[in-house]
Each structure stands twice: as structure tokens, then as C-alpha cells.
Amino acid sequence: MATRHQARMAVVSLLYAFDLGNGNIAEHTDEILEEKKIRNKQKDFALTLYEGVMANITPVDEAIVKHLKDWDFERLGAIERATLRLATYEILFGELDSAVVINEAVEITKAFGTEQSPKFINGVLDAISKDK
């Protein structure tokens, strides 16, 4: 059975695909989650997160842009942008403590991002959590 961490990693993958221009990714979420062995309650969790990010993409992106220091949103790597979107959504609209959300995002970034990404992600999300 998949963990919530694995479900979040799958959501980052979905957001990454969306960001790279795969506009019809929503049509393939079930098969992508199945391929990653995200099933049952974790599938419901992943879909809730993905759909929540997509439904709130404008306020999520605005919160990220507001807290980028000397960075242009469009210059962010697609993995970093996807991770920030998921974590920002959870900070703004979720029920988990911000510290838990930030830690999850940092761990996901360690798996997918560059060497500098975890520190960057941590800083942006910390600023967002303090401002919410």
C-alpha cells in the first residue's frame, strides 16, 4: 500500500506533466496513479490534492510569486514549481501543520530536484506559512 508521501510524489508528477504542457493530464490521472501503485484511500487523497491545486491554481501561484525573492516564477524549474504548488495548496487550504507540509515538500524535492532545491523550497514555503 502506498503512503501519503508516495501519493504526494505522484501528485507532483501530475503537476509536473501539466506544467510541461500536457493539458489533458486530467484524463489520465487514474492510469498514472495506478501505474505508480497509488490505490484506494491514497488514490482518493492524491486526487483530492491534485484537484484542489488545479481548482485553486491562481491563488496558489499568487502566493508563490509574492514570496519569491529575486526570482521569476516562469524561471523556476518545473519540478520546483510543481512541488511549491502542492505544498502551498496544503499550507493555504489544508489541515496539516505547515511544518509537516514543508518537510514533505523538502523530502520530495530531495528526490526530484537539484542539490540547491530543498533549501530554496524550504525558504519560500516558510515565508508563505508565516504570511497565511
From Swiss-Prot:
Domain of life: Bacteria
UniProt KW keywords: RNA-binding, Transcription, Transcription antitermination, Transcription regulation
One Gene Ontology CC term in the entry: cytosol
One annotated GO biological process: DNA-templated transcription termination
GO MF, any single term: RNA binding
Presence of keyword Thylakoid: no
Keyword rRNA processing attached: no
Pfam families according to UniProt: NusB (PF01029)
Physiological role: Involved in transcription antitermination. Required for transcription of ribosomal RNA (rRNA) genes. Binds specifically to the boxA antiterminator sequence of the ribosomal RNA (rrn) operons.
Family: Belongs to the NusB family.
Protein's UniProt name: Transcription antitermination protein NusB
Name of encoding gene: nusB
